[in-house]
Amino acid sequence: MKPLTRIFVFLLAATSIWSLLGEMYRLWPMRFFTLAVFLPACGALIALALYSRWRGDGRAGRIILIGAIAGFVAAVAYDIFRLPFVFSKSWGLAGLVPSLPLFKVFPQFGAMILGKADSNSLAVILVGWAYHFSNGITFGVMYAAMVNGQWRRRWPVAIVFAVGLELAMLFTPYPAVFGIRVTDTFVVVTLAAHLIFGVTMGRVCIGLEKGVAKC
């Protein structure tokens, strides 16, 4: 992709995490930004990918698609790694694995987006999880824009990007807003989870390169 296109794609994808950052820093309500900015940005990304396929050489569309798929798969791997910590007590692992409420923020995401005080309704929980995966997908697209399809040569960038995101979030109001105790255990586990996210994202992009090229 051309430099300006890469920047445009990166910024469109970044609107997912910006919706949360703006809420935390009291710049805008997450509900407003999600509806007015993030969802239209998603539409613009899809439109750009389709236009690239139908009117161009398809390169931009392939890069966006590979990044989105890899980001989703990486988010799944990230959550699978965290499952033993979330369910440590119920799975009888308390003596081996520390119990950490790593999933408790997702319903709160949903409550912010829907503008509801109750974070226990099914709609709130589903929207919260959907937002969580939207972050994974858009992080994948952001990474794709950064490396511009040079998946094999630059795949370590995925690790730096993923771990850097977590380190940056630790210095935002995120822990305070969601009542998270930032202990040594929490930091180690979340950094390890983001390391897995980065490795998975980078390697999945490499694996998808040939398959998506045929589409």
Model feature map: region roles:
Residues 63-90:
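N-terminal signal-anchor transmembrane alpha helix
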Residues 84, 88-92, 171-193:
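Interfacial helix-loop-helix junctions of multi-pass membrane proteins
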